[in-house]
Amino acid sequence: MTDGLRWQEVFQGIDSTLLQEPKFVRNKEKLLQTFGGKTSKESREKLLPFLWNTIAPNGQIYGNRAKGNRMNVLNPYWFSYPGYNEVLTGFADDKINSNDKIWNENITFLETLNNNASFKDKVAAFATWEVIPYIINEKRTNIPVNAGLE
């Protein structure tokens, strides 16, 4: 799962609209040379090569709104912690309304899996955000979480 990416860049490559904004771009020509392409497919593969050359051929990429493939969260906040909770538990929780480091009271599918005898102590999480241990509730679940800063 990714977080903090705009669907436009994921599916269409470099955003020419943002290239016109001096507050976002220092060297437009270099960006176009490095990440541009004759097609959006070529541009997106230059911008996110691992996603398109490794993950996509072996998995599924959802959320291309230009093709009507809308993936929406149900929570009203549209930012990280509420979204991760929703994905990991299967439901939105309006009480989760910040990205603060608060132990998640909800049971995630990772915890359910870890409580299954076949998977006991075989579940772990790897992330790059220091709030993930709280979302998974590492303290309660005893699921090892490496959040990149540990």
What are these regions (language model features)?
Residues 8-15, 66, 98-100, 135-139:
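Short, solvent-exposed loop/turn and secondary-structure capping segments
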Residues 30-38, 69, 89-98:
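Glycine-/proline-rich flexible loop or hinge segments
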Residues 1-60:
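Active-site-proximal N-terminal segment of extracellular/periplasmic enzymes that hydrolyze or transfer
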Residues 75-150:
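His/Asp/Glu-rich, glycine-adjacent segments
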Residues 40-41, 64-67, 103-105:
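A short linear-motif detector with a strong N-terminal bias
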Residues 10-11, 67-78, 123:
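Phosphate-binding glycine-rich loops and adjacent basic patches that engage nucleotide phosphates
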Residues 1, 8-9, 62-65, 86-89, ...:
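Structural recognition of the beta-strand scaffold that forms the well-ordered cores
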Residues 57-71, 117-121:
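N-terminal beta-rich core of secreted/periplasmic extracellular enzymes
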